[in-house]
C-alpha cells in the first residue's frame, strides 16, 4: 500500500481514475488513507473504528519530527516489550532517515503498519527517489540495481563517500545492522529498488 501511495503521489490527481471497486475489502483503501492521500473521491462507506493497537494508516514523512511522531504511534501497535519495541523503532528510524538524507524523494517516505492477530506486524516504507543504484554510484560502481542493494548492505558502504567506514554523520552501517537484526530474529526485510529485489 505504501508503494502505491508513493507512486500515486507522482501523478496529478486529475489523472487518477478509480473504477468501481467490487472487492469486500475495498474499505481498506479508504481506511488506510490511500484514496485521501491521493485526493481520489470515494463513495465507499464503512464504520470507522479506533486504529490504536491494530494499524497505522499511510503516513507521509518528510521531517525528523514527523518520523518521531510515527514511531511514537507505532510502539503500541507492536505489542512488544520496551526493549524489543526500541529495536523496531531503530529500524524504522534508520530506513526513513535513509529516505530523508539520501534519496531526494520530493514526497518523502510513505509508511504504514498493520498488526495481525497471529502476532505478526508488517511495516512498509516506500519512496520514489533516485534509487539505491544512483545513490551508491556516487561513491562506488554498481552495475545493476541488485549489485547496488548488495553494496548498501555491507558495513561502511555509503553513497556519501568512498572513505572506509563512511563519515561521522553517515557510517554506512544502517542497512547492515537492519539485515543483521532481521537475521538474528529469524525475521526478514525486503528491499525493492529499480529492478532489484532483495529478501
What are these regions (language model features)?
Residues 5-7, 82-116, 175-182:
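Conserved ATP-binding N-box helix of the HATPase_c
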Residues 36, 42-67:
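Internal, well-ordered alpha/beta segment that forms a basic, Gly-enriched binding/recognition surface
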Residues 130:
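Glycine-rich G1-box
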